A protein has these predicted regions:
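An N-terminal hydrophobic leader/cap segment in hydrolases
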Residues: 4-50
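Membrane-embedded segments
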Residues: 52-129
Length: 129
C-alpha cells in the first residue's frame, strides 16, 4: 500500500511539473488552416498595429462608412490565424458595420509569444488604432 501511495504521489508531481512548464503550449496552440477554400466576400485592407512593447501585429480592416457605421473589433481567438476566420468575416458582408480583425502576438506570423498580459496589450493597441 505504501509503494502504491508513493508511485501515485510521484506521478501526480510529475504531472504538475509537466503542466507548469508546458502550459503555454497547451493554452495557445496554433492550429492548421482548415478552411482552404474560403474566400473573403468583402474588400479588406491589411494593416499593422504597433503595440507599446514594440511588436507589430497584422490585422485586416474593412470600412463601409466610418461616420455612419459602428466598428467591430474582432479577435481571431485561440489557435489558428486570420485566414481561419474568413468564414466568420463573410457574415459581416450584409451588415452595416466596419470591422477590424487582428492576429495576436505569436499567431499569423506575428512576433512574440502569447501570454495573458500580452493579449491585454494587443487588445488595447487595437482599440487605440
Amino acid at each position: 500500500m505504501l509503494l502504491f501511495l508513493q508511485i501515485t504521489i510521484l506521478v501526480y508531481l510529475f504531472l504538475l511539473v509537466f503542466l507548469y512548464f508546458y502550459q503555454r503550449n497547451l493554452m495557445y496552440h496554433p492550429d492548421e488552416n482548415n478552411y482552404f477554400n474560403d474566400k473573403l466576400s468583402v474588400n479588406i485592407e491589411e494593416v499593422e498595429i504597433s503595440t507599446q512593447d514594440g511588436l507589430r501585429l497584422l490585422g485586416w480592416y474593412h470600412e463601409k462608412d466610418i461616420r455612419k457605421n459602428k466598428t467591430i473589433l474582432f479577435f481571431h481567438g485561440n489557435a489558428g490565424s486570420l485566414e481561419n476566420r474568413i468564414h466568420k468575416l463573410n457574415h459581416f458582408r450584409d451588415m452595416s458595420v466596419n470591422f477590424l480583425i487582428i492576429a495576436w502576438r505569436g499567431f499569423s506570423g506575428n512576433e512574440g509569444k502569447p501570454s495573458e498580459s500580452g493579449l491585454y496589450e494587443d487588445g488595447e493597441s487595437a482599440i487605440k488604432w
